[in-house]
């Protein structure tokens, strides 16, 4: 979590770090006589520029990946959307989901877990992830779906997402919009 925040901060302020590093290089070059060589100044400024370029390039690559992931996940969700809400509204306590309905829900759970994995790795922005969590919350109001979801979370097969982590994600998501 701390590294993710640092990464986002670095991406946002890489230009400020560049400015500070170049300023420090010039101050050191000016005040320390042993450093009065153009090679020191060139190396220090070049290194600072390279670091800034790396951060900017990494950010652009991650933005591209984020766009691809967002498109892929939204496409998969859109393909499931109608059936998912029909199931949510039609499945009541009087019956268990059929094997086809369970298979469909497992596909949805896998989509949710994949989204979580990419969020945890820092490739899905928190605002997007928590919007998705709030969307999941709407589906999980159905007690049968929620029961199956918790049973699946207990298996430990969803990329590290557990009941405890899910509860924390729900709590955090409530600060981004929909309250339970």
Residue positions per predicted region:
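Amphipathic alpha-helical "stem/stalk" segments
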Residues: 2-11, 59-180
């Amino acid at each position: 979590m701390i590294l993710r925040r640092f990464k986002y901060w670095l991406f946002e302020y890489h230009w400020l770090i560049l400015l500070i590093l170049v300023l420090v290089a010039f101050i050191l070059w000016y005040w320390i006589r042993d450093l009065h060589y153009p090679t020191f100044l060139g190396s220090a400024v070049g290194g600072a520029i390279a670091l800034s370029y790396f951060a900017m390039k990494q950010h652009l690559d991650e933005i591209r990946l984020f766009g691809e992931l967002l498109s892929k996940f939204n496409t998969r969700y859109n393909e499931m959307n109608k059936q998912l809400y029909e199931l949510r509204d039609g499945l009541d306590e009087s019956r268990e989901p059929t094997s086809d309905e369970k298979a469909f829900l497992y596909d949805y759970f896998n989509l949710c877990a994949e989204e979580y994995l990419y969020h945890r790795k820092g490739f899905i922005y928190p605002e997007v992830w928590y919007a998705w969590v709030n969307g999941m919350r709407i589906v999980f109001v159905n007690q049968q779906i929620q029961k199956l979801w918790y049973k699946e979370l207990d298996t430990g097969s969803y990329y590290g997402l557990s009941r405890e982590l899910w509860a924390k994600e729900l709590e955090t998501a409530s600060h981004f919009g929909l309250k339970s």
